[in-house]
Swiss-Prot record:
Gene3D superfamilies: 3.20.70.20
InterPro entries membership: HSV_RIR1_betahv, NrdE_NrdA_C, RNR_lg_C, Rrm1
PROSITE patterns named among the record's database cross-references: RIBORED_LARGE
Region (Disordered): 1-70, 89-129
Any GO CC annotation of this UniProt entry: viral tegument
Major location category of this protein: virion
Similarity remark: Belongs to the ribonucleoside diphosphate reductase large chain family.
Location in the cell: Virion; Host cytoplasm
Ranges of Polar residues composition bias in the record: 98-109
Name this polypeptide is given: Ribonucleoside-diphosphate reductase large subunit-like protein
Amino acid sequence: MNPADADEEQRVSSVPAHRCRPGRIPSRSAETETEESSAEVAADTIGGDDSELEEGPLPGGDKEASAGNTNVSSGVACVAGFTSGGGVVSWRPESPSPDGTPSVLSLTRDSGPAVPSRGGRVSSGLSTFNPAGATRMELDSVEEEDDFGASLCKVSPPIQAMRMLMGKKCHCHGYWGKFRFCGVQEPARELPSDRNALWREMDTVSRHSAGLGSFRLFQLIMRHGPCLIRHSPRCDLLLGRFYFKANWARESRTPLCYASELCDESVRRFVLRHMEDLPKLAEETARFVELAGCWGLYAAILCLDKVCRQLHGQDESPGGVFLRIAVALTAAIENSRHSRIYRFHLDARFEGEVLESVLKRCRDGQLSLSTFTMSTVGFDRVPQYDFLISADPFSRDASWAAMCKWMSTLSCGVSVSVNVTRLNADVNSVIRCLGGYCDLIREKEVHRPVVRVFVDMWDVAAIRVINFILKESTSELTGVCYAFNVPSVLMKRYRAREQRYSLFGRPVSRRLSDLGQESAFEKEYSRCEQSCPKVVVNTDDFLKKMLLCALKGRASVVFVHHVVKYSIMADSVCLPPCLSPDMASCHFGECDMPVQRLTVNVARCVFARSDEQKLHLPDVVLGNTRRYFDLSVLRELVTEAVVWGNARLDALMSASEWWVESALEKLRPLHIGVAGLHTALMRLGFTYFASWDLIERIFEHMYFAAVRASVDLCKSGLPRCEWFERTIYQEGKFIFELYRLPRLSIASARWEALRADMLEFGLRNCQFLAVGPDDEVAHLWGVTPSVWASRGTVFEEETVWSLCPPNRECYFPTVVRRPLRVPVVNYAWLEQHQEEGKATQCLFQAAPAIQNDVEMAAVNLSVFVDQCVALVFYYDSGMTPDVLLARMLKWYHWRFKVGVYKYCAS
């Protein structure tokens, strides 16, 4: 007998009989799994059986389970591509197939599923997970993956590693899942009779949080916390501190835990190289985060339950999270070929100074990654980006390779944008398949991805999508959001009161999609109306049904010709099939594009008046309160954001396939957003109506600093991006010159000097600002999202916690589950509200009341945003599509690229 067959037979015989599914062989060869994977994915993914999953304490007893320090992977055998070292399971990449063909999901060389490769067949050398020596918890997790996405794990082993990293073991029972505790009770609706006794009990339990005390403290916070915050918003910070204390006994406070094999190799080397200095830096960071951090209850839930991970059975500490982020970014800067130039622009001589600079920006909340990237950066086999824009023409057939690519991306928690009207498949079937799988992912993962479905409104398939949204609301997919690509010809016909609008089949609509210029599109559209088969609809009815879908809260509007007309592309380009899922980033290429978000916290540029000499500087804007806004600090933050973004792009391209590097090198896009704009205005004592000039100045300085930093990188010796000659920058133009010429606050001599340097040296990047929502990042730092106004002084947000029972016997689908809602406090209002019961001193206005002011401010700032601005529209329950249609026409005349990001009931 072959020795390999003998080992396989021994592993099969060691599997307990009660763990084997009836009618299925416990363990099969890799070749058999590969041949049957494409046939089993649909059944295992969509129709998996959850009846065999069992829950209960670990065999080690209640004491071991409640302690919460059992190694998750201590019993995993070292077989079939998985190696066990130091109690940590790590996936080792298999050798390529004999014929040298890459696998369908061999996305990266050194990291997890980044961007799927274009083609090829499934490799036959995929590793399998052997549960022979695993513990009961690990066996449960293996069976859960068989029900949840076993076939995808067989095709893409990095997803298996992603599961091991993203999962957590609860501290109360030892269950393997996504939360640190089980059983969230229904929040109390009334205050307790003796609030002082409740606070004393919380304080007593927090002092003895080891063992089951942390679970008791968690129950008290979840039970009475929301009601206490509604009654007294000031107790939000105290509840956030108690929420952190519930995790103190199980936190890993040593930075040496990041030398684990779960972390990226560059991070491990950096930690081992600086193992003498990092403990002191970690201690200072933990003390700063604990004392200076403004952590309310909702921010604490985001930090501990979305950002922090478990390593070797212990949770990350908040200070350790920021240290890991800083180490990962520093390693990306140092491992780049241009590290010396990056250090020069960061004003750092060696990597220790780079680490201190990056750590200061991260822990202060001045520059922030997305919450998803904050939770995954620095780890091995995980995505290094936030979103994926699917624009690959090879995916038009919507074949198994394309569906597997999108599902693999969703399995890793990354949101995807897909244009279904340009696929050679039934649009409703694709929506059901991707939406159903996305809902399964959202049930299992803390980071809930979405599928943004884009629909071309000149394709006849748009009628089917609209009917699907309106008629199948009972089985609505929670993970699917829609976006309608509205052409200019449709808006012009509605304005001219023309009643006939034509929709074409897929070949004609694709031919129209290749015409990005508005005049060429209208000319070809008129010709096709005369010579091609078409479906004629009423213009008013068609638009009203489209906006009725938008009023359901799951559809956005994109003026697709404005996206091309007011873009940085000088040559004629095709109409982009889709934007990013957050409706902020544009992509004009024909390859899948990963998006890396980076947010600048504008509220961190507001300071108290202490230095009288600095108040007379030209970059200082005095407020009505004892505060001022410093534009020079804002430019410094944007400059560092450009350096960070280029280093992250270098790291992503070095770990990806050649065609991903080629796609990113064309424009080297930086997706820089903002947060805390309304918070900054309230702290300065300004209303939104009186701040239009200040908002325009803020974005002018951001755009100037971004272009200046990109030019300086080329001036230092870096090559310009490949498509620089195809952009308006080659002609010496700036993005605001495509609109009306605004009143610039920066001296014209500085703009002309920048123009001359740009023509001489070029640009390292050609896309800079993308104003997305970034709401989770904003709530993490206690500021308002993006350029949006605050919804109220105290408002509620959904958390990752669910109120349904967690056990399998009481399983509820996603549409029945009720998420726990926690009040969020507007701290800019709370700072000025000195005593309870007195009128507030700051000028606060809720978002629905100043919606028109926010829209006008967006018109002014959009001239400096080279990508898109995502807005929120608040509507009343009695609003009709006619009213929304009139507002949509106004958005079109204001030259918005994205009419609205999402709709919210006021």
